């Protein structure tokens, strides 16, 4: 088994990190640059920033956040939210991001994936998918892709598994799958969804949505087949540290990069 990655996710709104439950009822979690620096010191393997405002007037704030963060951290940084063109991707990569995450824009313009992969390489393109279970009880499992996830998520009619297959064919180098049913609920990842995706994906898969404990992350990797596990609230609000998770995984035979940094506490919300 290859080394598995632990990735804190920072949802950024108006220059602050927030976290909600199923995309609603956001709580302030702190300053993004301070949190990123703390996670870097604590041994996180990567960081993900999502600009959940993503309006044109907020975009300059996000570019500045990425620039300041890139000057402080020395682990890969992925940035997503509102990236609608190759130029948008270029601005974030130039600001210091290592990868860009495409979601809603890719659904409405799938060739944006191919254009980004052609310009920057597949290793820079993460296809992020928000999926909701839509099968009736007793039916085979089925998940639909939603866009504009927030206060007004929009169904697309796209089957999540088929959309991911197409995204990979177009050049996505990594998949981040977020269970809308589990997001922020801290009841564990949707293992059935993860299994369905990892069974067909030749590229790395990041599990997102639902992590409430190191045990959930272990199951996401061992049972779900994820290459990396992403979490937000359990880290932001001090329930567990990166070291707690890595220790739990290592004790159960999951290979992780050793952590030598400090713990992430609640003092990063300046």
From Swiss-Prot:
Active site per UniProt: 11, 130
The keyword Cytoplasm appears for this protein: yes
GO cellular component: cytoplasm
Location(s) in or outside the cell: Cytoplasm
GO MF annotation list: imidazoleglycerol-phosphate synthase activity; lyase activity
GO biological process, alphabetically ordered: L-histidine biosynthetic process
Catalytic activity of the protein: 5-[(5-phospho-1-deoxy-D-ribulos-1-ylimino)methylamino]-1-(5-phospho-beta-D-ribosyl)imidazole-4-carboxamide + L-glutamine = D-erythro-1-(imidazol-4-yl)glycerol 3-phosphate + 5-amino-1-(5-phospho-beta-D-ribosyl)imidazole-4-carboxamide + L-glutamate + H(+)
Matching InterPro entries: Aldolase_TIM, His_biosynth, HisF, IGPS_HisA/HisF, RibuloseP-bd_barrel
Chief localization: cytoplasm
E.C. number(s) listed in UniProt: 4.3.2.10
Pathway(s) it belongs to: Amino-acid biosynthesis; L-histidine biosynthesis; L-histidine from 5-phospho-alpha-D-ribose 1-diphosphate: step 5/9
Pfam family for this entry, one: His_biosynth
Top enzyme category: lyase
Protein keywords: Amino-acid biosynthesis, Cytoplasm, Histidine biosynthesis, Lyase
Keyword Transport in annotation: no
HAMAP family in UniProt: HisF
Family: Belongs to the HisA/HisF family.
Subunit relationships: Heterodimer of HisH and HisF.
Reported function: IGPS catalyzes the conversion of PRFAR and glutamine to IGP, AICAR and glutamate. The HisF subunit catalyzes the cyclization activity that produces IGP and AICAR from PRFAR using the ammonia provided by the HisH subunit.
Official protein name in the record: Imidazole glycerol phosphate synthase subunit HisF
Lineage, broadest ranks: Bacteria, Bacillati, Chloroflexota, Chloroflexia, Chloroflexales
Gene name of this polypeptide: hisF
